[in-house]
Each structure stands twice: as structure tokens, then as C-alpha cells.
Amino acid sequence: MAALRPLVKPKIVKKRTKKFIRHQSDRYVKIKRNWRKPRGIDNRVRRRFKGQILMPNIGYGSNKKTKHMLPSGFRKFLVHNVKELEVLLMCNKSYCAEIAHNVSSKNRKAIVERAAQLAIRVTNPNARLRSEENE
């Protein structure tokens, strides 16, 4: 079967590709890079002084048409069993299935087989599948 392609694949434009880093995380090891909003009364970043690191705000949001879209052009839908896969039957050109991390390898095989029958793309079909020579 040929590779499943989305119905439309618009160009995904990100307004910012760099991560927003936490104020003074480059100075101290104990301060992690994960973003935290500065709340100090004298904080330069919170007051948006020129030359300081940028704060995330609504203006950096993605286009509504391409929000949550994968580079392949599909949107992800988390699947835990074969029954949940049936939901994607009518919208298999815009959504792809992603098998949840806590699904057993036996159920994964069943989900991947059923997805092939329904022409639904699976983002992680080879996860946790052992090859025959290892068994």
C-alpha cells in the first residue's frame, strides 16, 4: 500500500522557533532553562526593557489552520485500543493515529493491522515491536 498522504498540506510557518528561556538561567546552574514568568517588582524582563530576553505572549501563536499540525500534514489522535481507531475512519485524510505509550505490544500489533485495513496512518507503528531473530 502506498504511503498515506493528507488531504491538504499547507506550509507550516512558526513565528518563533527558538525556545523561551528563563531569566538568569544562563547565569546559575540551579535555575533551569524551562520558562517561568518573572514576577519580581523590579524585574527587567517582566517590564520588557530593550535588550532583555523575550517573554512568550499570544502574538507568537500559530496559525489556526496549521496549529497542532505535524510536518507530514496530519494532526495526532491518541489511540489506546482498536475501538478508538474506528473514530478516525471518516477523517483519515486529516488525522493520524498515535499509539499511547502504555499499550502492550500484543495490542499494538492489532492496532497497526486494523489501521492498515482502514487506511489510517500511524505515527509510531514500530514502537515496542521486537524482531523475529531476537525471540
Swiss-Prot record:
<dbReference type="InterPro" id="IPR001515">
    <property type="entry name" value="Ribosomal_eL32"/>
</dbReference>
<feature type="modified residue" description="Phosphoserine">
    <location>
        <position position="62"/>
    </location>
</feature>
<feature type="modified residue" description="N6-succinyllysine">
    <location>
        <position position="50"/>
    </location>
</feature>
<dbReference type="GO" id="GO:0005840">
    <property type="term" value="C:ribosome"/>
</dbReference>
<dbReference type="GO" id="GO:0071549">
    <property type="term" value="P:cellular response to dexamethasone stimulus"/>
</dbReference>
<keyword id="KW-0597">Phosphoprotein</keyword>
<dbReference type="GO" id="GO:0022625">
    <property type="term" value="C:cytosolic large ribosomal subunit"/>
</dbReference>
<dbReference type="GO" id="GO:0002181">
    <property type="term" value="P:cytoplasmic translation"/>
</dbReference>
<dbReference type="GO" id="GO:0098793">
    <property type="term" value="C:presynapse"/>
</dbReference>
<dbReference type="InterPro" id="IPR018263">
    <property type="entry name" value="Ribosomal_eL32_CS"/>
</dbReference>
<comment type="function">
    <text>Component of the large ribosomal subunit. The ribosome is a large ribonucleoprotein complex responsible for the synthesis of proteins in the cell.</text>
</comment>
<dbReference type="GO" id="GO:0140242">
    <property type="term" value="P:translation at postsynapse"/>
</dbReference>
<protein>
    <recommendedName>
        <fullName>Large ribosomal subunit protein eL32</fullName>
    </recommendedName>
</protein>
<keyword id="KW-0963">Cytoplasm</keyword>
<dbReference type="GO" id="GO:0005829">
    <property type="term" value="C:cytosol"/>
</dbReference>
<feature type="cross-link" description="Glycyl lysine isopeptide (Lys-Gly) (interchain with G-Cter in SUMO2)">
    <location>
        <position position="9"/>
    </location>
</feature>
<dbReference type="Pfam" id="PF01655">
    <property type="entry name" value="Ribosomal_L32e"/>
</dbReference>
<dbReference type="GO" id="GO:0098794">
    <property type="term" value="C:postsynapse"/>
</dbReference>
<dbReference type="GO" id="GO:0003735">
    <property type="term" value="F:structural constituent of ribosome"/>
</dbReference>
<keyword id="KW-0687">Ribonucleoprotein</keyword>
<keyword id="KW-0832">Ubl conjugation</keyword>
<keyword id="KW-0689">Ribosomal protein</keyword>
<dbReference type="GO" id="GO:0140236">
    <property type="term" value="P:translation at presynapse"/>
</dbReference>
<dbReference type="GO" id="GO:0097421">
    <property type="term" value="P:liver regeneration"/>
</dbReference>
<comment type="similarity">
    <text>Belongs to the eukaryotic ribosomal protein eL32 family.</text>
</comment>
<keyword id="KW-1017">Isopeptide bond</keyword>
<dbReference type="GO" id="GO:0045202">
    <property type="term" value="C:synapse"/>
</dbReference>
<dbReference type="GO" id="GO:0006412">
    <property type="term" value="P:translation"/>
</dbReference>
<dbReference type="GO" id="GO:0005737">
    <property type="term" value="C:cytoplasm"/>
</dbReference>
<comment type="subunit">
    <text>Component of the large ribosomal subunit.</text>
</comment>
<dbReference type="InterPro" id="IPR036351">
    <property type="entry name" value="Ribosomal_eL32_sf"/>
</dbReference>
